[in-house]
Amino acid sequence: MKSLPKLKDTLLPARPDDILEYDEAWSFVLKKINKRWLWTVLCRRTRQIIAFVIGDRSENTCRRLWKKVPIEYRHCLSYSDFWDAYQKVLQHEAHHAVGKESGQTSHMERWYCTLRQHQARYVRKTLSFSKRDAFHHMVTKWFIVDHNLARKQLASLTL
């Protein structure tokens, strides 16, 4: 875990016109009653996850997520669903709450499909699960860092 780069070191530079998508996905540790929510922020242009936290669905967890969003991305136009925590924490004029039918969080939803395809612990009806929070976090971070580095490599090839 210590050999993984920091998430911010896997990111492409922010641009003023970047658009962010916020969303969360359900998982559990050991038993389904031990719910964990993966909160993520995706940059639409780069398709990279710029911040994530694992916790409950509270306003406090949303605040933790906001604190992890790099400064250079905080001014960006952003979209989330109507979950109350987003409305309380993301109160800047660049944030918009939208329904799934708007398509404004479709890239984030698509990324969750990729996550579920590669990480069985995020599949809704599964026999795979983490036994400890630390393992759950480690595997998730590993997947996100690998995803971001792959996107960064792809961007360098197209320049």
Residue ranges, per PLM feature:
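Residue-level recognition of single "structural anchor" positions
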Residues: 1-159
